[in-house]
Regions:
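Short intrinsically disordered, low-complexity coil segments enriched in acidic
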Residues: 1-6, 171-175
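Serine-esterase "nucleophile elbow" of acetyl-processing enzymes
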Residues: 4-79, 83
Length: 175
C-alpha cells in the first residue's frame, strides 16, 4: 500500500467457511460448531495439511435447533471419516422478545434452548451423525467469561454435563 494508506489485515485471509477441494486419498473431516470453531478452522487446517481434508459447515452452527434444521444439508452426500462437533454456546444464550441478547436477570430474557430440550436435541443430532458411520468426536462448550452479554457464568458447566450424558450413552469421546 501507498504511504499513509491503511492495510486491511483480513483482505488476504482465506474464508474458513469456504468449500475446499479434497486431496484424493486423504480422510475427510468435518467440523461442526459456532464462531469458536470458525476461529480454529484455519489453524487446524494448516496443522493437518497433507494429513486430512478438513471441511467445516458453511455457517455458524448456532444452537441445536439450527443444527436439527440444517444437519442433512451440512452433511451432504459424500462420505465423512471423522466429524468433530459442538453445540451449546448459542443454546444457553438468553434472548429477548425481539431476538436480542439479554442478561438472564433482564426483563424478558429467556434461555434460547432450555437444558432439557438441549439434551434431547443433541441426542437426535448424534443419532443422525451416527448414520454417517464417521468417527464422531464431541467438543465441550467453552466456558462463559464474566460480562458476556446474554450468557451466565457457569451455564456452560451445566450444558456440558447434559452433553456428557448424551455422549456417554452413545459412546462418543469428548475432546
Amino acid at each position: 500500500p501507498a504511504l499513509g494508506q491503511a492495510q486491511n489485515p483480513k483482505a488476504k485471509r482465506p474464508n474458513p467457511m469456504a468449500p475446499i477441494n479434497d486431496v484424493p486419498g486423504l480422510p475427510r473431516v468435518l467440523l461442526i460448531g459456532d464462531s469458536i470453531s470458525i476461529g480454529y478452522t484455519l489453524p487446524t487446517r494448516a496443522l493437518l495439511k497433507g494429513k486430512v481434508n478438513l471441511h467445516r459447515i458453511p455457517t455458524n452452527g448456532g444452537p441445536t435447533i439450527k443444527g436439527l434444521e440444517h444437519i442433512d444439508a451440512w452433511l451432504g452426500k459424500k462420505k465423512w471419516d471423522v466429524i468433530h462437533f459442538n453445540w451449546g454456546l448459542h443454546d444457553l444464550k438468553y434472548m429477548g422478545p425481539k431476538g436480542e441478547n439479554l442478561f438472564p436477570k433482564e426483563k424478558g430474557g429467556k434461555v434460547q434452548v432450555p437444558i432439557g430440550e438441549y439434551e434431547k436435541n443433541l441426542d437426535r443430532l448424534v443419532a443422525r451423525l451416527k448414520k454417517t458411520r464417521a468417527r464422531l468426536v464431541w467438543r465441550n462448550t467453552t466456558p462463559v467469561p464474566p460480562g458476556s452479554k446474554g450468557r451466565h457464568v457457569g451455564d456452560s458447566i451445566k450444558y456440558n454435563a447434559a452433553a456428557a450424558r448424551v455422549m456417554i450413552r452413545h459412546g462418543i469421546p469428548t475432546h
